[in-house]
Each structure stands twice: as C-alpha cells, then as structure tokens.
C-alpha cells in the first residue's frame, strides 16, 4: 500500500519535490499528476483534490497513483492546459473563466447575479444542459469531468465599498475573463488581469486597489490583510472545471477508466456538498482575524444588481440564450 503525500510537504522546488513523490508510486502503476493553484488544505478545491487522490490511491492501488501539486507548484492556470495536451500533467481544475481561448460557452458562469446560491449552481451542474456543457471543448482535445464549486464571490478594496459608485476609478484584479472586465467597467472601475499567485503582492504594493473572490480564497491567500474589509456581494459563482485531455482519458483501459470516473463523480458530489460549510468557516476566520465584512442592505444590493446585470446582453450570443435560461431555471427548483 502506497502512502499519499502532497507535493507541498516536499522541498519548495519541483526539482526537489519530484523524486520524493515518484517514490510514493509503485512500479507498473499509472502516475496521474494533478496540478492546481490553491492551498492544499482549507480550500474547497485543494480539499477536493486531496480527497480524489486519497480515493484513487486507495481503491486503485496497483493500477494508478495520483500525485497532487498545489499552489502553482508545477503550472499556473494559464500554462496547465498546454501541459495537459503534452502529457506533463493529467488533471487540472482551472476556474471556468480560464477557458475562453477554447470555448465561449463557459462565460455563462461569469455572468453577474446569475445564480442565487451554491444550491442553484449544483442543480444546473446536475441538469442535462449542465452535463452537456462538460463536452464543450472536445473539438480541441479537452474533456470536462465535473464542476467543482468554490463559493460565491465577494468584493474587497482599499476603501469601503457599499454601492458600485464607491468603486469608481479603482483598479480591480480579475481573472482572464472578458465578462469580468465588462462587469468592472460597469462599476466605473478599471480591470487588471493577473495570475492568482500575483494577487497578494499586487494588493500589498498598490498595483491594484481591490479584487473579487470567494471567502476561502480571501482567507487562505490572506487577501484580507491588505484590504479595507470585504463587501458581501455574492455577485458571481467561482467554479472550477476538473479537466483532462481526451487523448489521455481515451487511452485508459475500459475497466480503469470506468473505475476512475466513478471515483471522480462521487468525490465531486461529496466535495461540492461541503463547500457552503467551508465558505462559512473561512468567512468567520476572516472576522476573527479582525477584518471588516460589510453586509449590504436590500437597497444597496439592488444598486449592484442594476449596475451589473446589463452586462448579460454583451455576451448572450456567445453563451446562448438556452443555456442562460437553463441556469436561471435552476434558481427556482428544489
């Protein structure tokens, strides 16, 4: 029986970490490398990756060995897609915003105030349109294995934000997302696209004034330390696509592929069920650390919705009205 170990407990560099990890795999086992950009624990994606590796390494012992590389140790999300096609890694879970070079359909998840809450996101993911959307990139060699939620996004800045006009003239870090860029412009603010690993330093040095993220990202990356509080807007979902290359998945023996995908499906359901509690816990940790969380009044929240929702019209043709309708209908189910 192999022992599962995260790359994070090895040396700080990949050159030192790689041999230590290789020793955890047995001769003849298929090595599955999973690269992601967040903390190894205490974060919904990091915890889900660990859970997946533990299940694979236990239940597929002798067949497969999964190694997890957190905190951009191997690749950031901008480089990992090429690495998947080259076979340098087998699994990644970038934010859905990161796939614009391959499909515009995932812009759906960036639309502001589309989903009411995480339960709505889960219902859409389980629906037929949501499942079909996993295959949006098969023509370029990628296949989605599941959606991993991280939570709803909040805004923070170096000054209090209560209504959109408070953000006028500020510079906000965003992911590589045209929807997010349009949303920030609708606030009268400026968008700056930066890699996740660069955000803390950019906030600390004033390269950007603010950012938008989940409670888990804000806490585990310590963004709250260099911001004047967080405004609880819940304006977007942050979700990740667990993705692999179609070539790698198709090359597995049928029984291995079936067992692996069954584990992936079960871990996805279990991990997503835990997100709301993890987000609430990290929100409380931010408060306990002495940061300020600003809760909007209904009138203030309406001002954010009114400012941002017109952005939908700019991207309706890219996404498809049918997908937008399916996502909206998930708010009314359950």
Role assignments for model-derived ranges:
Residues 1-5:
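Positively charged n-region of N-terminal signal peptides that target proteins for export
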Residues 7-15:
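Bacterial N-terminal signal peptides
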Residues 16-22:
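Sec/Tat signal peptide C-region and signal peptidase I cleavage site
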Residues 23-120, 128-334:
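N-terminal secretory/targeting leader peptides
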